[in-house]
Structure formats: C-alpha cells, structure tokens
Amino acid sequence: MQKKAIRSLLWMQALLCAMFLFACSNDDDNSNAPLPKPDPKEVKVQVAADTKTNTATVNVANAPAEASLSLVLDINRGKALDQATADKNGTHTFKLPLLAGYEQKLKLVVKSGGTSAEVNNLTLPAAEEQYTDEQITQGLQGHVWQSVQTRSRILVGHTGTRPYSQFVTQALKRFEFLADSKFTFTVLSPLQKSFPNGTWTVKSKRIDIDTQIPLGPMQLHNTRIQNLTNKELVMLTEVEDGLFLLTFEAQ
C-alpha cells in the first residue's frame, strides 16, 4: 500500500514537471515571436502642398506607436529627406520645402520592432522657378558666396568614385560668379586651393558651371536657384548623376 502511494506521488511530480516545462516552452516561443509587421494599407498618409509658401505637409496616421518614420526620395540612390518617430498614437506631421523646378517623388518607410513597410506614390509638386535670367545674373555677381555645409545635403547619391559627398557636406568653399562668364572656385578647408579658370552660363533660369577640383574637371549642370537674396544663395544642382542641395552665405 505504501509503495503504491509512493508511485502515485512520483507520477504526480512527473506530471507537474512536464506541465511546467511545457509552459516554459510556450513562454519562450511567445518571447521570440516577431512583432506584427507594419501594414502599409493601414498606415494613412496625406500630402498637402502650399504653392504660396512653397512648403508641404505630410501627415502620417495609424502607424505603430513610436515607429521610426523616414521620408525618402523614391528614385535610385535617393536619400532620406526627413526622419522622425511617431507618437504613441502613431501619428506625425512632416514639413518639407517644395523645390523649384523639381518634383519630389517620395515614399514613407515605417519601421517597428525590426520589421518595416513602405507607403509609395507620394508626390510633392515642383515650386515655380521665380527668378529671371537677369535677376540670377545680377544676384550671383553681387557677392562672393561661401558655403554653409550644415545646410547643404545630398539628395541623390552619385555612382562615380569621386568624393562629391565631401564636396557637399565637408569642404568649406567659395563661388565667385564674375563678368564675361568667368568663374572662380576656391577651397578653404580641409585644404586651400583656388581654381580661377572656370566658366558659368545662365539660360532659361538654369545655370551650368564648368570648374575643377583637385581630382580633375567638375561640372555643375541644370542648376536651379531655390533662393537668392543679398544674404543667401540656395541652389539645386546635378553633378554627374547625383543631385545636391547647396547653401551659401554672402561675404
């Protein structure tokens, strides 16, 4: 009788151990289960452009709480234009400038819990190219222009081997638009070098610049003026197959 009771007790202990191990296994499975993937059909995006102020808002709703949000140029080698974190309600509002002479095709990248989704086919219209050729010529020749690296950026990366990223965001430089289509490009940092034999032209509101860097010739073509005042010059320019936004201050 005593042996039978002992066997029953051992059997109950074994059963309890098995149940405990099964429960732990389920807990482990749940802890390793991937978080729900953001669903682009559920994320809502509204784009509103104001051509009077040349600004746009991109309103995001229904994203996962505190998800990472990135607005990216939806073309080959396109860079992120802005990044943010959704609030606890999964909402955020981006504010972006419209670019003169350039339509921005964007996608929203939503990342949460190691997974991601995209919302495509977002378009910001091009702003009007407001300056005439004469205004551009007079404005550019009115000052020596020194770069502001912190406000210059790469919008589309180039495929070549030249370090144009350093030209855009690191090199302190000056542009001088002189009479008779003469152009001087001066690098102030990280090295000091002047290239006085360049040329520039303006036609149909677009500027082309032929100059050089220490590695050889460089062309800035199809350049669109974004802002031109007595204090600031902002230009959107193409170098090889890259697209750069360059900001300068008058000296």
PLM ranges: what are they?
Residues Q2-M12:
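Bacterial N-terminal signal peptides that target proteins for export
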Residues P34-N59, P64-S68, D74-G78, D82, ...:
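Lipid interaction determinants
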Residues A14-C17, Q138-L140:
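A generic structural signal for short, non-catalytic loop/turn and secondary-structure boundary residues
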Residues S25-A33:
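Bacterial lipoprotein signal-peptidase II cleavage site
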Residues F20-A23:
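C-terminal motif of bacterial Sec signal peptides marking the signal peptidase cleavage site
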Residues C17-A18, K193:
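Residue-level signal for mature regions of secreted extracellular proteins and peptides
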